[in-house]
């Protein structure tokens, strides 16, 4: 079975919708996706993800199934460097890397700032929602592997957000989302692909075959959005520092 995880198009966060650029990205993505066969489509309830999904869904006259746990990862923390509450990722590297528990696949969510922000409950909600969905499609979580109840080659499509995508990937790959949040960037309308591997009958794991693919943008000369990235060098004042 294959999982395709899509981040929404270039966002207008204030309006929870897409920018004009984001709508163009979504149409280019739909050009790619409409050539593929998906057994099921799951969508975040947030507007920017729904608008991205709709560019694809309306072409096929089908509907996606909304899953609340696919919303952007919601807990916030107070960031002393910024002086106000912010998301649970985008820490300064010298801050988060100093806490070794952040690298632990289970310990990351139990660092005091995470506990105080309600991260464990939110993360478990995402984990449970994902596992319940995978069981519906024939793969049941058992410890660190998946029991194959119904082996299949279906393709499942998700429209969601970078933060929750990394939480999902951490669960499927057995790693903390912190290095994913801070060491990767799923650009807008990028596609991440995971595939089951059943090397022994009845026992499966997921392998990530590609991360953040934006070939559908590059092929048509669309420069990927800078959204979710930070400045390449300190002296580049045109790019985001915080």
Regions found by a protein language model. Name each.
Residues 7-20:
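Glycine-rich N-terminal loop/short-helix segment of MobA-like nucleotidyltransferase
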Residues 111-145:
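Internal catalytic-core helix/loop-beta-alpha segment
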Residues 45-46, 69, 151-163:
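Short, well-ordered beta-to-alpha junction loops that form the rim of enzyme active sites
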Residues 1-4:
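Extreme N-terminal starter segment of soluble prokaryotic enzymes
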């Amino acid at each position: 079975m294959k999982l395709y995880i899509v981040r929404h198009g270039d966002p207008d966060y204030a309006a929870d919708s897409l920018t004009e650029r984001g709508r163009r990205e979504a149409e280019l993505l739909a050009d790619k996706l409409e050539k593929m066969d998906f057994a099921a489509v799951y969508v975040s309830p947030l507007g920017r993800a729904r608008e991205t999904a709709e560019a694809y869904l309306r072409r096929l006259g089908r509907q996606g199934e909304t899953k609340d746990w696919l919303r952007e990862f919601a807990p916030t923390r107070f960031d002393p460097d910024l002086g106000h509450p912010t998301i649970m990722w985008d820490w300064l590297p010298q801050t988060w890397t100093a806490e070794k528990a952040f690298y632990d696949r289970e310990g990351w969510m139990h660092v005091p700032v995470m506990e105080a922000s309600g991260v464990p409950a939110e993360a478990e909600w995402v984990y449970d929602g994902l596992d319940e969905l995978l069981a519906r499609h024939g793969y049941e979580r058992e410890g660190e592997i998946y029991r194959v109840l119904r082996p299949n080659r279906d393709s499942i499509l998700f429209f969601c957000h970078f933060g929750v995508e990394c939480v999902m990937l951490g669960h499927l790959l057995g790693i903390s989302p912190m290095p994913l949040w801070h060491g990767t960037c799923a650009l807008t309308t990028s596609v991440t692909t995971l595939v089951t591997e059943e090397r022994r009958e009845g026992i499966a794991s997921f392998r990530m075959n590609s991360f953040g693919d934006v070939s559908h943008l590059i092929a048509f000369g669309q420069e990927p959005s800078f959204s979710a990235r930070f400045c390449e060098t300190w002296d580049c004042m045109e790019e985001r520092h915080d």
